[in-house]
C-alpha cells in the first residue's frame, strides 16, 4: 500500500484532472476540504487539551471538601500511609533537627526540660496538620486527574472520525514541508526527547509526577526511569526512520543524517 509515494499519486491524479478539464471544480473542492480539515483538527485538538484540564481543575476544589471528610475518619489514613510514610518521617526528622539547632543557638540553659518537650510537641502537631493537608491535596489532585483521564479517553473513543481527520491533517502538514524543514523538525523533537540534555528534563518531569501523585521520592526508581525512557524512544524512532521514512523519502533520511552529524 505504501510502495508508491503519496506525492507521485497526487501528481498523477492532478495531471489526470487537467486532461479531463475538471481542475477548477477540483481546486474549489480541495480548498473547502482543506478548510474543513484545518478547522475540525484544531477544534478537536483544543478540545483534547483544554477540556480534561479545565474539568480537572474545576473538580479539584469541589473534591477537596469531600476528601477532607473522608480523610478525617481515620480509617482511610492506613490506605495512604505507605505512600507518604517516608516523606513524613523525613519531615519529622528535619523539624527535629531544626528545633534542636534552635535550642543550641538560643540560651535554653534556664528553660526547664518539660517546656522544651512542650515546644517539641507543638512543632510536631503543626507538622502533622501540614502532613494531613498535603495528603488531602494529593488525593483530591489524583482523583481530579483520573476523572480528566477518563474524559480524555471518552473523547478519543467517541471522536474516532475526528481523530482520523486530525491524523490526516498532521500528515499533510508534515509532508507539505520541504525535506530540510522535515529533517529540522524531526531533529528538534528528537533532541528534546532523547538528546544529550534530555535526562535533566525527564528527571524534572518524573519528579513532578511523583510529587503530584503522592509517591515517595526514590532515587533508584527515578534514575532507572530516566535511563530507560530515552533508550526506548530512541529505538522506536530509529525503527520508524528505517521502516517508514527510508521508504517514503530517502532524501529526507540523507538530509537528517547530515544535519545530525
Swiss-Prot record:
Membrane topology reported for the UniProt record: Multi-pass membrane protein
InterPro entries given in the database record: CemA (IPR004282)
Coiled coil (residue ranges): none
Pfam families assigned to the protein according to its UniProt record, in alphabetical order: CemA
A GO molecular-function descriptor: antiporter activity
Signal peptide (residue range): none
Principal location class: plastid
Reaction equation(s) it catalyzes: K(+)(in) + H(+)(out) = K(+)(out) + H(+)(in)
Gene Ontology terms describing biological process: potassium ion transport
Keywords (A to Z) from UniProt: Antiport, Chloroplast, Hydrogen ion transport, Ion transport, Membrane, Plastid, Plastid inner membrane, Potassium, Potassium transport, Transmembrane, Transmembrane helix, Transport
Chain's role: Contributes to K(+)/H(+) antiport activity by supporting proton efflux to control proton extrusion and homeostasis in chloroplasts in a light-dependent manner to modulate photosynthesis. Prevents excessive induction of non-photochemical quenching (NPQ) under continuous-light conditions. Indirectly promotes efficient inorganic carbon uptake into chloroplasts.
Designated name of the protein: Potassium/proton antiporter CemA
Amino acid at each position: 500500500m505504501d510502495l508508491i509515494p503519496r506525492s507521485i499519486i497526487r501528481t498523477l491524479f492532478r495531471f489526470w484532472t487537467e486532461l479531463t478539464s475538471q481542475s477548477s471544480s477540483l481546486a474549489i473542492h480541495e480548498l473547502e476540504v482543506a478548510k474543513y480539515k484545518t478547522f475540525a483538527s484544531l477544534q478537536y485538538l483544543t478540545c483534547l487539551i483544554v477540556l480534561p484540564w479545565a474539568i480537572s481543575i474545576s473538580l479539584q476544589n469541589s473534591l477537596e471538601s469531600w476528601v477532607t471528610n473522608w480523610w478525617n475518619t481515620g480509617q482511610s489514613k492506613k490506605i495512604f500511609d505507605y505512600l507518604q510514610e517516608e516523606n513524613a518521617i523525613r519531615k519529622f526528622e528535619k523539624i527535629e533537627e531544626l528545633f534542636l539547632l534552635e535550642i543550641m543557638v538560643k540560651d535554653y540553659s534556664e528553660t526547664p526540660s518539660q517546656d522544651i518537650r512542650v515546644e517539641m510537641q507543638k512543632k510536631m502537631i503543626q507538622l502533622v496538620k501540614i502532613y494531613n493537608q498535603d495528603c488531602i491535596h494529593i488525593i483530591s489532585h489524583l482523583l481530579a486527574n483520573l476523572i480528566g483521564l477518563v474524559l480524555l479517553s471518552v473523547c478519543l473513543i467517541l471522536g474516532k472520525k475526528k481523530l482520523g481527520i486530525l491524523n490526516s491533517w498532521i500528515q499533510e502538514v508534515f509532508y507539505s514541508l520541504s525535506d530540510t524543514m522535515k529533517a529540522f523538525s524531526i531533529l528538534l523533537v528528537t533532541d528534546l526527547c532523547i538528546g544529550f540534555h534530555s535526562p535533566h528534563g525527564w528527571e524534572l518531569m518524573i519528579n513532578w509526577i511523583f510529587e503530584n501523585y503522592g509517591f515517595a521520592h526514590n532515587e533508584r526508581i527515578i534514575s532507572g526511569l530516566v535511563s530507560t525512557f530515552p533508550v526506548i524512544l530512541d529505538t522506536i524512532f530509529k525503527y520508524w526512520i528505517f521502516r517508514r521514512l527510508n521508504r517514503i523519502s530517502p532524501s529526507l533520511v540523507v538530509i537528517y543524517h547530515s544535519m545530525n552529524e
